[in-house]
């Protein structure tokens, strides 16, 4: 034993001074004093448990004592009757054994390899004992889990990383994966559980027993993130689920991790052998796999960047020439050649390194240098951690802990130790660079590109200072990192093949560089990640965005401008094809060309395939709406033109739907016989509301009324003849069905037919004569108001002319001014009471006083009031042109008409852009004050005077 340095002797005196009065200090041997001066962990432990000192004196730690751990622990667990007792005994046993290991290590009673063996064996003993005790307890509670043949099913635990390799460090956490063999259910318990439930509950209890801090501390920090799907995956998986995951989705890093996987406890059972056989092909390839080098180089680059980013100086694990680089060197040969060289299929590093040397895979002498460096670094790491039982690999900055490490490493002082350490790490670094290479000599552009890869692949934390996000404020930077982290977690729940992962890893750095260079980075990122989540299993779409940078830029621009567009793309990724050509993306179809475009589009689909026809209609609508929205966002279409395009689109789709419904009805029943000697179908569709008024928005529904001119005695001419009027009723029902059927692309439009005569209680389809009679004799004033905004959007010219005449006759009927004024005003007040603003501290652009509905009521009132004298007022069905007519016919002065038109278009523009943002139609209470004052003044003038 090396004598204590003056500084450590002085520290021992400090320790002695703070020992309890009844502590047997006089009985302490020089070895005990040295270890207590070296390790605060040992000092605190033996103060709490003085009896442990006696055991150390009576039975000095030995290299092979790990073989007794299981028996020693079982003796302690004999009397345990509940989980609290189990947790206490596990913690006390772990602490006592760790004191013995720290003692032996500090005094060099055992070799470094033997220390690693003891630490790993202790962890395995504690894990297996806890599992077995809890398994028995769970079986007592719920019965024994069995397969279909009644054979009991065990919980198998894979120890990963250093635990699996038998190289656990002093204060390590433990990486575990839980598995059970076959599906089934419990038998013999008070309550039956399926095996998945049983093992999940057992796994949760096991983690709690090991990980939960109590007054006695904890056993080990348990990390389950290496399991399939990480934190978002099931806690325990069946063998079948494990095999499916690793065959279909296993990633490079999971393959590397599985090299060290070892089954805890019984390694010779049937199920253990089955699990090992299942995993071996995933880990060790039959062919020589040189792609491993680049993958490991990428991983090493990621770690090097993490060291730089976090300022991890003096890190003996992650730093240049550290423990991780030795592990990488060994893994390169295991993964490249392990499938062909069984000697390389070992979990522990040092035996594998010896096999590498025997196979002459490294230059002469390099394996010996790596072995020496590994043992040096692992001893230094374990000594460092045993000072405070603290998980750290960063060398201390304070003089006391430096003196402790110099003593533990048998050097005169810290400077000597530092020189030895530098020499060892330089040797490792040289071998690593010669084998794997490095990524540190990068140009500024390469470094920036690396930062984007880092941002995607390294799961950065909030305090990581990446130049890529330097321009964002703290809040936005945190938002970006959180969005990326959430997206990665979501990906873990998805079944993504290796090709999909590869394309995604190519795409994401480019996408992040485009998004994060924007000042509003969190906004488009939050909107695009749901889209990406939806397409990650469809590699074609990922490749489209990866291979066409222009499409990616357009996607970001559109999603940043409108969550509505982002949502539409997320729901219907087929629309991504529309992003490929910017010349067409921002150029909507000409208003008079929608019908022809749709006809051409439907030619791609078999006419007899109703399902594909429905799908094609919906896809056409979505693609055209995307073009309209893109032009809208780009500012090339004013709001009135946007509505024109949306209205023309709706009419084209209505035309196609009627044709489709007509064809289906005629195929079934034939056509009504009154059509034999005439052109057309004797059918018309009247558009009301926004459709009738050329004011459709992106999510507007269609207000429709159906008319026909079929005489009462007519039948159809098909084999299954039906009454002609019944034919038109079923035709209208079929049209409604085609609009509202929900396919994978959603519905076409919501259709509302309640504006028909007698509303929901009336016939769905009426004759033109019945419609005229209802309007003349039964309709309410509000129904005549609605007629102002009605026009035929599909139908025979003769029937259209008949409707126009009915509308003109009704609207030009003389009305008593005061009565009309009262009825219109009362209807508006009733609407406001029923539909008024639910947010009193906001202004509802449509429903509140001074809003859009008031303007509509003013124009409708004035048409009904003055059309008897000025029939030209009935010409148009949209508010803007009605206001023009009112001015041209000297009913409203031009200044007021212009002011109301300005207010109307301004408010509609605002409502329209709120819809693009998926925002409700209410704004700050002071908004649009000038426009509202104008509307209120006109309301007062026309409807209150």
Swiss-Prot record:
SUPFAM superfamilies: Nucleotidyltransferase, Nucleotidyltransferase substrate binding subunit/domain. It comes from the Bacteria. The keyword Nucleotide-binding applies. It catalyses: [glutamine synthetase]-O(4)-(5'-adenylyl)-L-tyrosine + phosphate = [glutamine synthetase]-L-tyrosine + ADP; [glutamine synthetase]-L-tyrosine + ATP = [glutamine synthetase]-O(4)-(5'-adenylyl)-L-tyrosine + diphosphate. Residues 449-945 are annotated as: Adenylyl transferase. One of its GO terms (cellular component) is cytosol. Transmembrane segments: none annotated. One of its GO terms (biological process) is regulation of glutamine family amino acid metabolic process. InterPro entries: GlnE (IPR023057), GlnE_rpt_dom (IPR005190), NT_sf (IPR043519), PII_UdlTrfase/GS_AdlTrfase (IPR013546). GO terms for molecular function: [glutamate-ammonia-ligase] adenylyltransferase activity; [glutamine synthetase]-adenylyl-L-tyrosine phosphorylase activity; ATP binding; magnesium ion binding. Residues 1-440 are annotated as: Adenylyl removase. It is an enzyme of class 2 (transferase). Keywords: ATP-binding, Magnesium, Multifunctional enzyme, Nucleotide-binding, Nucleotidyltransferase, Transferase. Pfam families: GlnD_UR_UTase (PF08335), GlnE (PF03710). Its cofactor is Mg(2+). Involved in the regulation of glutamine synthetase GlnA, a key enzyme in the process to assimilate ammonia. When cellular nitrogen levels are high, the C-terminal adenylyl transferase (AT) inactivates GlnA by covalent transfer of an adenylyl group from ATP to specific tyrosine residue of GlnA, thus reducing its activity. Conversely, when nitrogen levels are low, the N-terminal adenylyl removase (AR) activates GlnA by removing the adenylyl group by phosphorolysis, increasing its activity. PANTHER family: BIFUNCTIONAL GLUTAMINE SYNTHETASE ADENYLYLTRANSFERASE_ADENYLYL-REMOVING ENZYME, GLUTAMINE SYNTHETASE ADENYLYLTRANSFERASE. Belongs to the GlnE family. This is Bifunctional glutamine synthetase adenylyltransferase/adenylyl-removing enzyme. It comes from Klebsiella pneumoniae (strain 342).
């Amino acid at each position: 034993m090396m004598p204590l340095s003056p500084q450590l002797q002085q520290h021992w005196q400090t320790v002695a001074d703070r020992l309890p009065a009844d502590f047997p200090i006089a009985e302490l041997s020089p070895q005990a004093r040295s270890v207590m001066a070296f390790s605060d962990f040992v000092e605190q432990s033996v103060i709490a448990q003085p009896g442990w000192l006696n055991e150390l004196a009576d039975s000095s730690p030995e290299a092979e004592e790990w073989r007794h751990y299981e028996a020693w622990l079982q003796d302690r667990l004999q009397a345990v009757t509940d989980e609290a007792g189990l947790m206490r005994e596990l913690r006390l046993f772990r602490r006592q054994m760790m004191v013995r290991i720290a003692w032996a290590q500090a005094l060099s009673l055992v070799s470094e390899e033997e220390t690693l063996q003891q630490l790993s064996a202790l962890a395995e003993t504690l894990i297996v004992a806890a599992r077995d005790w809890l398994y028995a307890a769970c079986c007592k509670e719920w019965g024994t889990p069995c397969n279909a043949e009644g054979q009991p099913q065990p919980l198998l635990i894979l120890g990963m990383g250093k635990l699996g390799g038998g190289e656990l460090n002093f204060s390590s956490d433990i990486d575990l994966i839980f598995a059970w063999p076959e599906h089934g259910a419990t038998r013999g318990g008070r309550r039956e559980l399926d095996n998945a439930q049983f093992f999940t509950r057992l796994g949760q209890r096991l983690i709690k027993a090991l990980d939960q801090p109590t007054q006695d501390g904890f056993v080990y920090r348990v990390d389950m993130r290496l399991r399939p799907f990480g934190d978002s995956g099931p806690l325990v998986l069946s063998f079948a689920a494990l095999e499916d995951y690793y065959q279909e989705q296993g990633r490079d890093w999971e393959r590397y991790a599985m090299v060290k996987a070892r089954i805890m406890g019984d390694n010779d059972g049937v199920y253990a052998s089955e699990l090992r056989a299942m995993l071996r092909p995933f880990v060790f390839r039959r062919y020589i796999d040189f792609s491993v080098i680049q993958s490991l180089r990428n991983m090493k680059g990621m770690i090097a960047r993490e060291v730089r980013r976090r300022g991890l100086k003096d890190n003996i694990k992650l730093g240049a020439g550290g423990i991780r680089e030795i592990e990488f060197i060994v893994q390169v040969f295991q993964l490249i050649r392990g499938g062909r060289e069984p000697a390389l299929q070992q979990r522990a590093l040092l035996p594998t390194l010896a096999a590498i040397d025997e196979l002459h895979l490294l230059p002469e002498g390099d394996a010996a240098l790596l072995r020496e460096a590994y043992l040096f670094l692992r001893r230094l790491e374990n000594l460092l951690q045993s000072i405070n039982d603290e998980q750290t690999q960063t060398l201390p900055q304070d003089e006391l802990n430096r003196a402790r490490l110099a003593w533990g490493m048998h050097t005169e002082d810290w400077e000597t130790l530092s020189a030895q350490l530098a020499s060892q790490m330089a040797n490792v670094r040289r071998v690593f660079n010669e084998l794997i290479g490095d990524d540190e000599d990068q140009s500024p552009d390469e470094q920036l590109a690396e930062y984007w890869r880092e941002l995607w692949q390294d799961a950065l934390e909030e305090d990581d200072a990446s130049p890529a996000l330097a321009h964002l404020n703290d809040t936005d930077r945190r938002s970006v990192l959180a969005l990326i982290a959430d997206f990665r977690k979501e990906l873990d729940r998805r079944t993504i093949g290796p090709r999909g992962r590869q394309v995604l890893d190519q795409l994401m750095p480019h996408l992040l560089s485009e998004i994060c260079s924007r000042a509003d980075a969190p906004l488009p990122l939050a909107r695009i990640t749901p889209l990406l989540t939806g397409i990650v299993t469809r590699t074609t779409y990922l490749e489209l965005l990866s291979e066409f940078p222009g499409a990616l830029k357009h996607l970001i621009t559109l999603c940043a401008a409108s969550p509505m567009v982002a949502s539409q793309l997320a729901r219907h990724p087929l629309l991504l094809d529309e992003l490929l050509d910017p010349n067409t993306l921002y150029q909507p179809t000409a208003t008079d060309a929608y019908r022809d475009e749709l006809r051409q589009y439907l030619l791609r689909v078999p006419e007899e395939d109703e399902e594909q026809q429905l799908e094609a209609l919906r896809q056409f609508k979505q693609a055209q709406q995307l073009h309209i929205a893109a032009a809208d966002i780009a500012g090339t279409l004013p709001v009135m033109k946007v509505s024109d395009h949306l209205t023309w689109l709706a009419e084209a789709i209505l035309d196609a739907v009627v044709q489709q419904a007509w064809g289906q009805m005629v195929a079934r029943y034939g056509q009504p016989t009154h059509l034999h000697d005439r052109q057309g179908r004797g059918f018309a569709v009247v558009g009301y509301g926004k459709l009738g008024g050329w004011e459709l928005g992106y999510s507007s529904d269609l207000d429709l009324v159906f008319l026909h001119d079929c005489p009462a005695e007519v039948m159809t001419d098909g084999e299954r003849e039906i009454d002609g009027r019944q034919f038109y009723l079923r035709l209208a029902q079929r049209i409604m069905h085609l609009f509202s059927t929900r396919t994978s692309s959603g519905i076409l439009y919501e259709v509302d037919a309640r504006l028909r005569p007698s509303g929901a209680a009336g016939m769905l389809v009426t004759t033109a004569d019945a419609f005229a009679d209802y309007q003349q004799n039964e309709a309410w004033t509000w129904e005549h108001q609605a007629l102002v905004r009605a026009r035929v959007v599909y139908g025979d010219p003769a029937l259209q002319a008949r409707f126009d005449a009915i509308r003109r006759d009704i609207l030009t009927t003389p009305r008593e001014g005061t009565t009309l004024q009262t009825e219109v005003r009362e209807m508006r007040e009733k609407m406001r009471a029923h539909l008024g603003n639910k947010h009193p501290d906001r202004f509802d652009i449509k429903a509140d006083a001074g809003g859009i509905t008031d303007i509509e009521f003013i124009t409708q009132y004035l048409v009904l009031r003055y059309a008897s004298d000025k029939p030209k007022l009935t010409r148009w069905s949209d508010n803007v042109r009605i206001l023009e007519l009112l001015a041209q016919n000297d009913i409203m002065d031009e200044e007021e008409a212009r002011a109301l038109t300005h207010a109307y278009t301004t408010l509609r523009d605002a409502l329209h852009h709120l819809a693009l943002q998926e925002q409700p139609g209410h704004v700050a209470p002071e908004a649009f004050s000038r426009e509202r004052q104008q509307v209120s003044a006109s309301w007062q003038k026309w409807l209150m005077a």
